[in-house]
Amino acid sequence: MSDRSARLQALQNALKERILILDGGMGTMIQSYRLEEHDYRGTRFADWPSDVKGNNDLLLLSRPDVIAAIEKAYLDAGADILETNTFNATQISQADYGMESLVYELNVEGARIARQVADAKTLETPDKPRFVAGVLGPTSRTCSISPDVNDPGYRNVTFDELVENYIEATRGLIEGGADLILIETIFDTLNAKAAIFAVQQVFEEDAVELPIMISGTITDASGRTLSGQTTEAFWNSVRHAKPISVGLNCALGAKDLRPYLEELSTKADTHVSAHPNAGLPNAFGEYDETPAEMAAVVEEFAASGFLNIIGGCSGTTPGHIQAIAEAVAKYKPREIPEIAKACRLSGLEPFTIDGQSLFVNVGERTNITGSAKFARLIREENYTEALEVALQQVEAGAQVIDINMDEGMLDSQAAMVRFLNMIAGEPDISRVPIMIDSSKGEVIEAGLKCIQGKGIVNSISMKEGVEQFKHHARLCKRYGAAVVVMAFDEVGQADTAARKKEICKRSYDILVNEVGFPPEDIIFDPNIFAVATGIEEHNNYAVDFIEACAYIRDHLPHALTSGGVSNVSFSFRGNNPVREAIHSVFLFHAISNGLTMGIVNAGLLEI
């Protein structure tokens, strides 16, 4: 067993035994040293062309003694886990100082210094090993929010750029000796999803895997992140990372953090962490909450069973950490709850589909192939009016909206990205999950890079063979999306009940047993075909679909079902009263036999 493996086993053991202590504010302690420009420059950067004071990460290279002393003080105060001083060690953040070329070195040194300090403390107290969390900060840019109020579809950073930044930082942290990766101070969940994607890519490419800690930031009394998500929606969006812990930090003091931490402690099937500020800043931007005051609030968290890991953020000092460590020492760590399997989606708000859920309406009018009005607006690049179509679907009761931009004369990828970016700026629409609908893999992936919530991909299938099917499934899993799986294989679409059952069973086994895809995130579409076509072989299409739904419900545990409801009445196009009547009768029987959701014109159904 390697040293790192032994430490990780010790970490797992410690989490079972007690509430672990994270360190406190690094910036707060650096300020106490009253460092000047020459301290930040040191000898190496004496002639740097721009001011560097305030670039706290640079102290890893110019004043490593200061960083090591602060980290030692936190360990002496009772901390179990040190956070590396790498909060801004990405190319995006270091560009403010023209120091992008130092990023890899900063991450290596950040982890190496913390590793040395932690190992020295472990030698003093072998029965209490210390650990290093390699920090990935949020950067100074947001992938979900436009910095230009006049152009809500504009972004000053892309998902791919963030991934590139985080890959470099992650590799440096691992080389330097980090035990865990901590993605923290998440104010935009899409940034965090990019970090998760990058970290998992490094794990896969470099044949190494460390536990991931995730910590979001509730920015104010609204109980939401800066990008608008609630606590539960945030958790649903990042849960695919299977983190060793999820928590909240920064922006709020412990007292104000309480309701959101309590909610997280009941929803998360992993360890829960918190590192709040020392209260709220005063008029001078300083934090006044004393160690005793903060420890009293945190002790109540521990007594209430909310905590597995606790530390401090802005304004906290070794004094705060010592008081907190002493206050929680007598309490058992929170027990991880058993959370029932369910499809847990999110937009700005959570949306759960389980055995008790009513039929889910997926709004179909934002599909360029199904709405002439929407198609015209997109072709004219009138995205503002196109948003009204989406809003009407949500207001009419759509709990998910299906977005499809597949049209021969359109740049489908650009249209998908633009529309999704604009939706992100409309909370009345973006509160619901998104279904990204395309037959083109590149359009689906471009769409996944735009949504901070947990959405649905529509669709994947075995049409191009099993290996391609598994590739698409793994990619969707990496992005944290649920998937619609069509009853379609190398031979063609399933058109009989027997074929529908056979293909769905085969797809399910491959996804669950070979890809490791969560069964609750699999949504089968057993193909709704038109009836009343005048062709005898088509007469049983609706019944075959309903029979397949019942089979999936009864034989493929936790999987869901969906379908394009308007297909069944296609023979009657132009006769809306007849079509609506057919839809209602069809849905009555399909839902009774297990149909979970349908792509419908929300508001025009009578069930």
UniProtKB/Swiss-Prot annotation:
One of its GO terms (biological process) is methylation. The keyword Hydrolase does not apply. Its cofactor is methylcob(III)alamin; Zn(2+). The lineage of its organism: Bacteria, Pseudomonadati, Pseudomonadota, Gammaproteobacteria, Pseudomonadales. Catalyzes the transfer of a methyl group from methyl-cobalamin to homocysteine, yielding enzyme-bound cob(I)alamin and methionine. Subsequently, remethylates the cofactor using methyltetrahydrofolate. Binds 1 zinc ion per subunit. Keywords: Amino-acid biosynthesis, Cobalamin, Cobalt, Metal-binding, Methionine biosynthesis, Methyltransferase, S-adenosyl-L-methionine, Transferase, Zinc. It comes from Pseudomonas putida (Arthrobacter siderocapsulatus). Pathway: Amino-acid biosynthesis; L-methionine biosynthesis via de novo pathway; L-methionine from L-homocysteine (MetH route): step 1/1. GO terms for cellular component: cytosol. Residues 8-328 form the Hcy-binding domain. It is an enzyme of class 2 (transferase). One of its GO terms (molecular function) is cobalamin binding. Belongs to the vitamin-B12 dependent methionine synthase family. This is Methionine synthase. Residues 359-607 form the Pterin-binding domain. It catalyses: (6S)-5-methyl-5,6,7,8-tetrahydrofolate + L-homocysteine = (6S)-5,6,7,8-tetrahydrofolate + L-methionine. Modular enzyme with four functionally distinct domains. The isolated Hcy-binding domain catalyzes methyl transfer from free methylcobalamin to homocysteine. The Hcy-binding domain in association with the pterin-binding domain catalyzes the methylation of cob(I)alamin by methyltetrahydrofolate and the methylation of homocysteine. The B12-binding domain binds the cofactor. The AdoMet activation domain binds S-adenosyl-L-methionine. Under aerobic conditions cob(I)alamin can be converted to inactive cob(II)alamin. Its EC number is 2.1.1.13. Zn(2+) binds at C250, C313. L-homocysteine is bound via the zinc atom.
